[in-house]
C-alpha cells in the first residue's frame, strides 16, 4: 500500500485556477467517497484552502491511482486534464510523507510558520474519519504529521516573529510598554488593516477601545466587534490624550496629526508614553512627532523592516524544522520496519519449532527404551539448542526498526528461510494485526 499526494498550491497555480479547483461542495463526504471509489484508491482525504488544494490517498497502484485522481480532479471541476496537469505536483511514498509533514508544520505555506494550516489539516482529517474514508494509512500518518508539527513549533522559533503588518504593530507595542494589559487604544479608520490590528490588540487584554472613521456607521460596526466605543471623526483629536496606542489607516490624503498637536497632547498626558502606528499611504501622522520625548511613531516602512527581519529569523528556524521533519520520517519508517519484524520473528520461530518437534519425535520414536524423564531431557535439550541458535539473529531482527539496514536483514531472513509471515495463521490476533499493519503502510 502506497501513500500518495496530488495537488496544486500558490507555488504552482494562479489564484484563478485555485478558485476553480477548490472543493467547496455541499456534500464533502460524498466527494471523499467518490475518491475512494476510484480504481486502486482505498483511502482519501482532501485539504482545500485558499492557497492549496491537495488530495491525500492510499493506493496499491501508485501510477494508476495518480492517473485516476488527476482525471477526477479535472472532471469534477469541469476542466480538461491538459489545463490542470502543468500545475499539479504528485508525490508518493517517502516524498509524499515528507510533503505532508512539511505542510502540517507550515514549511510549505505562503507565510512561513503561520498556524492556520495545522487546524485546516486537522479539520480535513476529521472529515475523512467521519466520512469513513480514512483507514490504516491515514490513521497512522496524520497523527505523526501532527506530532511533527508540534515538535517544530515547540523546538524552533518559526512562529515567534511577526510577519504581518498588523501583528508586527502589536509586537512593537509590547516592546514599548512591556505589557499591553489595560492600555487604551484608538483606531483611526475602519478598513481591513485596522480590523486586523484591532483583533490582535484585543487579544492582549487591553483597556478601552475607541474607533473613529469619516463614516460613523463603519466606526460603530468595528467598535461593536471588539467591545469598543465609536466617536465622531471630527472630534477624535479631543480623545487622543486618553489613548496609549493610536493606529491610523485612512485615505485622508494628508496629515491628520501634526507635531504641534502631539506636543500639546503629550503635555496633557504628563509625558506618559504614546505609541503611534501609521500604516496609511500617504501617511496620516507628521513624521516630525518622532522628535517628541515619549512619543514613538512607526510607519509602514518601519513595520515592513520589522517583518523582513522577522522573516529572516523564521527562515533560520525553518532549517532546524527541516531537520525535525527528517527525524520524524526516520522515526516513522523505523516504526514501520518494526511492524514487519514482529510477524517475521514469529514466523521464523514457528518454522524452527516445527522442525525441532518433527525431528525430536522421529528420534524419540527410535529410542523406545528411554523412560519419561529421559524423553523430557531430550525435549529440553533440543529446545535449548534452538533458543541458543536463534537468540542472536532474533535480537538483531527485534532492533531492525532502529537501524537503516533493518530492511536488508528482514528481507534476507525472508529469502533464506522462505518465510511469508503475512499469509501464516496464528492462534492469536496480535501477529495477524501486526502483519496487516505492515502490509497497509509499505511503500
From Swiss-Prot:
Function: Catalyzes the NADPH-dependent reduction of glutamyl-tRNA(Glu) to glutamate 1-semialdehyde (GSA).
Underlying gene: hemA
Organism: Syntrophotalea carbinolica (strain DSM 2380 / NBRC 103641 / GraBd1) (Pelobacter carbinolicus)
InterPro entries in the record: 4pyrrol_synth_GluRdtase, 4pyrrol_synth_GluRdtase_dimer, 4pyrrol_synth_GluRdtase_N, GluRdtase_CS, GluRdtase_dimer_dom_sf, GluRdtase_N_sf, NAD(P)-bd_dom_sf, Shikm_DH/Glu-tRNA_Rdtase
Record has RNA-binding as a keyword: no
Residues the UniProt record annotates as site (Important for activity): 99
Keyword annotations: NADP, Oxidoreductase, Porphyrin biosynthesis
EC number of the protein: 1.2.1.70
Feature: compositional bias, Basic and acidic residues: 430-443
Subunit structure: Homodimer.
PANTHER family: GLUTAMYL-TRNA REDUCTASE
Residues reported in the UniProt entry to bind NADP(+): 189-194
Name of the protein in question: Glutamyl-tRNA reductase
